[in-house]
Amino acid sequence: MESSSSTFLTTTSLDKKKPSPVSRKSPKQKKKTTSTNKPIKVRYISNPMRVQTCASKFRELVQELTGQDAVDLQPEPIYSPSSDDHNLSPPAENLAPRVLHQEPFGERDSDCYEPLNAEDMFLPDQMSAGFSGFFSNGFYNVNDFGSIDSM
């Protein structure tokens, strides 16, 4: 093989038996870009509005509201406590107490809601039957161990 300034690789094609040289190019270096871009203008919207538009007008509406030609909004004043803030109160109509109209339980509801009895809730027979279902996978049986007193 001859040596030269560029690197050659030999590959064999399936159709041909002769090796063919393939040149390997050095990776391209990235060009450094100068920062000639203008700074990004960030716009915070404190009081958003709802608009309706169709799909074809959506892009135009977004450009109108946020693009270069968008009208700059007046910045809101920074919060500072003043005497006006202490006098703020919600409208009187919102202060009226709300009464929920609930009917007491009727006879038809009492069939669904029976009072709980503690004796009915914790019967040992029901509890042991319930727990044995957890252990019935064949590895061991709870009843094979016998009682605790026999150990």
UniProtKB/Swiss-Prot annotation:
Sorted alphabetically, the Gene Ontology BP terms of this entry are: cellular response to light stimulus; defense response to bacterium; positive regulation of DNA-binding transcription factor activity
Q: Where is this motif: VQ?
A: 58-67
Q: Looking at the keywords, is Amino-acid biosynthesis present?
A: no
Establish whether keyword Chloroplast is in the entry. Answer: yes
- Where does this chain carry the motif Bipartite nuclear localization signal? 16-32
Keyword terms of this UniProt record: Chloroplast, Nucleus, Plant defense, Plastid, Transit peptide
Q: What induces it?
A: By light. Accumulates in response to infection with the bacterial pathogen Pseudomonas syringae. Induced by infection with the necrotrophic fungal pathogen B.cinerea.
- Locate the compositionally biased regions of type Low complexity: 1-13
> What is the consequence of disrupting this locus?
No visible phenotype under normal growth conditions, but mutant plants show impaired induction of some defense-related genes triggered by pathogen infection and treatments with salicylic acid (SA) and jasmonic acid (JA). Increased susceptibility to the necrotrophic fungal pathogen B.cinerea.
A Pfam family it matches: VQ
Q: Where in the cell is it found?
A: Plastid, Chloroplast; Nucleus
Query: What function does this protein fulfil?
Result: Contributes to plant defense. May regulate chloroplast metabolism upon infection with pathogens such as Pseudomonas syringae. Functions as activator of WRKY33 in plant defense against necrotrophic pathogens by stimulating the DNA-binding activity of WRKY33.
Q: How is this protein organized at the quaternary level? A: Interacts with the sigma factor SIGA in chloroplast. Interacts with WRKY25 and WRKY33 in the nucleus.
Return the protein name: Sigma factor binding protein 1, chloroplastic
Native source species = Arabidopsis thaliana
What's the name of its gene? SIB1
